[in-house]
């Protein structure tokens, strides 16, 4: 009996630790706002100190990780490739959008390389990349935002309690209305999961309640 109680205690302790770790990962702070910590898996640290992917994290103000504007690549960098399948522009910089993935693109999901969607007979993108409204594969708001046809689209995915507890891809926020996206309307008050501004406290409370039951 004593051995069984000991095993149960160890199991409960492990569950509490894993719940704590999961909650911490969801609300990962980084950069100046997070004791200069770097994000896991080379995720971008936004100017506000949160980890994630997409323009709000990897664009202007990005502090570390796979920032779009800080990585050199291509012939200007000894043939180096961009992280996270970003495009390498003709000038040797990593990023997304026409200036990176368009004319002269040296590597990554260049527009001339990977086509998809209704423009290509319904073809899907590899690795769950987003298929933009124009029929090209990639990541970021230009591909995963309005008009996204397939893949990890950010704005048309149901999530949260009304979608069976589903979470958003790429650490996008699940708004209080149950849709995936980035910005105050998604990550602010009522945010259910993802990179929410205040997800840590809510996640700990929810996990503690679950364990207590």
UniProtKB/Swiss-Prot annotation:
PROSITE patterns listed in its UniProt record: CHIT_BIND_I_1, CHIT_BIND_I_2
Residues of the Chitin-binding type-1 domain: 28-69, 70-112, 113-155, 156-198
Source organism, top-level taxon: Eukaryota
InterPro entries named in the record: Chitin-bd_1, Chitin-binding_1_CS, Endochitinase-like_sf
Record bears the keyword Repeat: yes
Positions of post-translational Pyrrolidone carboxylic acid modification: 28
Binding residues annotated for substrate, in chain numbering: 37-39, 89-100, 141-142
GO MF: carbohydrate binding; chitin binding
Signal sequence segment: 1-27
Subunit structure: Homodimer, u-shaped.
Other comment: The 4 sites proposed for binding to carbohydrates (N-acetyl-D-glucosamine) of receptor molecules are on the surface of the agglutinin molecule.
Name listed for the protein in its UniProt record: Agglutinin isolectin 2
Species this chain originates from: Triticum aestivum (Wheat)
């Amino acid at each position: 009996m004593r051995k069984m109680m000991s095993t149960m205690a160890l199991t409960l302790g492990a569950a509490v630790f894993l719940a704590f770790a999961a909650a911490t990962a969801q609300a990962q702070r980084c950069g100046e706002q997070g004791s200069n910590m770097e994000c896991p898996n080379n995720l971008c640290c936004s100017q506000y100190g949160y980890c994630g992917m997409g323009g709000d994290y990897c664009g202007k103000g990005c502090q570390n990780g796979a920032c779009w504007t800080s990585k050199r690549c291509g012939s200007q960098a000894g043939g180096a490739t961009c992280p996270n399948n970003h495009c390498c522009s003709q000038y040797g910089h990593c990023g997304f959008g026409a200036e990176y993935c368009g004319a002269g693109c040296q590597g990554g999901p260049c527009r001339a390389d990977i086509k998809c969607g209704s423009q290509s007979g319904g073809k899907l993108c590899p690795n769950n990349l987003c298929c933009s409204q124009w029929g090209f594969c990639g990541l970021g708001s230009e591909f995963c935002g309005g008009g996204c046809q397939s893949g990890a689209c950010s704005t048309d995915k149901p999530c949260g309690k009304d979608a069976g507890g589903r979470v958003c891809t790429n650490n996008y926020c699940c708004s209080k209305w149950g849709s995936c996206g980035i910005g105050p309307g998604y990550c602010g008050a009522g945010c259910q999961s993802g990179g929410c501004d205040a997800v840590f406290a809510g996640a700990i409370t929810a996990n503690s309640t679950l364990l207590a039951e």
